Amino acid sequence: TGTPVKILVVRNILLLLFCLVVLLVFAQSSFLPPCEPVNETVAVEKEGCPKCLVFQTTICSGHCLTKEPVYKSPFSTVYQHVCTYRDVRYETVRLPDCPPGVDPHITYPVALSCDCSLCTMDTSDCTIESLQPDFCMSQREDFPVY
């Protein structure tokens, strides 16, 4: 009579552990901000222009669910999804005090919608640690917000 009771106890413990893992996965994803457009202060600068321009725009930010396999096979590839642009519109700003001969205009993407997908280096910063979006190498010029 002792063996069926032990099997029942082990089964209940395994079921409880499974439920806890599922609960933790859902709890973690509900506390992390989703991938969505957010307002952010960014800086743009251009070689030849003495000042960088700091202004507000909309970027994609948030968390995407990822999977990291325990066993990494040399024959399989792991693709990690990141929060990146889905739909964008482009706007142009003029940098102040650029000397003659230097085009003072910079065009940048404005996020309309975001998506968890593979990182596209053409439109996204996919580095592990990057500079803050409002970092400037040159003198700052804050753009008035209307």
Swiss-Prot record:
GO cellular component, one term: extracellular space
InterPro entries according to UniProt: Cystine-knot_cytokine, Glyco_hormone_CN, Gonadotropin_bsu, Gonadotropin_bsu_CS
Alphabetical UniProt keywords: Disulfide bond, Glycoprotein, Hormone, Secreted, Signal
Name the UniProt record assigns to this protein: Gonadotropin subunit beta-2
Signal peptide, first to last residue: 1-28
Organism: Ctenopharyngodon idella (Grass carp)
Similarity section: Belongs to the glycoprotein hormones subunit beta family.
Subcellular localization: Secreted
Gene name, Swiss-Prot/TrEMBL: cgbb
Pfam families for this protein: Cys_knot
